[in-house]
Structures are given as C-alpha cells and as structure tokens.
Amino acid sequence: MTWLDDIRWDRDGLLPVIAQEAATGDVLMFAWMNREALARTAELGEAVYWSRSRGRLWHKGEESGHIQKVRDMRLDCDNDVLLLKVEQLGHEPSIACHTGRHSCFYQRYESGAWHAVELVLKDPEHIYR
C-alpha cells in the first residue's frame, strides 16, 4: 500500500483539486487528478492534472508557460479533495486561468446576473503556443 491508496478516488478514478496561491491564499482554479497525475505532481513538484475534455494528462503551463510550482499538498478530512498551495509562474501578475485572468473564479453573482470582476491580464490569443 502506498500514500496514493489513502485517497478516496471517485468512481472514475479521479480526485477534485483546488489550486490556491501559496503567498496570497487566492483560489486560482479547480481541476481533477487521476492517480498518475498526482504521482507526477509529487515527483516533479509542479502541478499535473487530468484533463477530462482532452482525455489526457495536462502539465499546467505546458502550452502557456504558466507553471504551478507546488509548495504544499493537503488532503481534506474525508481524503477525497486535494488542496495544492502553489506558486503561479510565467507572468507577473500571475495568470492561472485560460481566459488570461489571475483566477478562474472571476465571475461574481450580483443582482441576478454574473459579472466579470477581474481584468484580463493577457489576451489568451497571445498566451497559448
């Protein structure tokens, strides 16, 4: 039995992951990991996720250069959600979202509608190679 066996993977073999900026506490994004992604993350010290849409491993920053250096990994009390405390690299200020924003959580509910409350820091057309 390994440390990976302590995790309660969902029926698809996935684990929900929250990426939080270590320095500020900002929640950057939500993603998924499978067993291989988590093992690679621990080995590399950089976030590697499972892309459900692409059906493959996704090393964060592989196309954009916006790599997430993992500073701490914490498993929740039920062993079924992972918190990654990361240093977001590749742009200053940091960009974690594919929309060119700091965080994927840039929409706020106000007065019956969703409103973008974070600026686009870099046009996504100039991010991806």
Swiss-Prot record:
Q: Which controlled-vocabulary keywords does the entry list?
A: Amino-acid biosynthesis, Cytoplasm, Histidine biosynthesis, Hydrolase, Magnesium, Metal-binding, Zinc
Record's Pfam families? PRA-CH
- Domain of life, source organism: Bacteria
Q: What is its EC number?
A: 3.5.4.19
Keyword Metal-binding assigned? yes
Q: Where in the cell is it found?
A: Cytoplasm
Q: What class of enzyme is it?
A: hydrolase
Its recorded reaction(s) are: 1-(5-phospho-beta-D-ribosyl)-5'-AMP + H2O = 1-(5-phospho-beta-D-ribosyl)-5-[(5-phospho-beta-D-ribosylamino)methylideneamino]imidazole-4-carboxamide
Q: What does the entry's cofactor note say about binding and number?
A: Binds 1 Mg(2+) ion per subunit. Binds 1 zinc ion per subunit.
> Which GO MF terms does the UniProt record name?
magnesium ion binding; phosphoribosyl-AMP cyclohydrolase activity; zinc ion binding
Q: Which cofactor does it need?
A: Mg(2+); Zn(2+)
Fetch the InterPro entries from UniProt: PRA-CH, PRib_AMP_CycHydrolase_dom, PRib_AMP_CycHydrolase_sf
Instruction: Indicate which residues the UniProt annotation says bind Mg(2+).
Output: D76, D78, D80
The pathway where this protein functions is: Amino-acid biosynthesis; L-histidine biosynthesis; L-histidine from 5-phospho-alpha-D-ribose 1-diphosphate: step 3/9
| Annotated binding of Zn(2+), by residue | C77, C97, C104
Q: Which GO terms describe its biological process?
A: L-histidine biosynthetic process
Q: Which NCBIfam families match?
A: PRK00051.1
Under HAMAP family, the record lists: HisI
* Name of the protein this chain belongs to: Phosphoribosyl-AMP cyclohydrolase
Organism, scientific name: Methylibium petroleiphilum (strain ATCC BAA-1232 / LMG 22953 / PM1)
The beginning of the lineage is: Bacteria, Pseudomonadati, Pseudomonadota, Betaproteobacteria, Burkholderiales
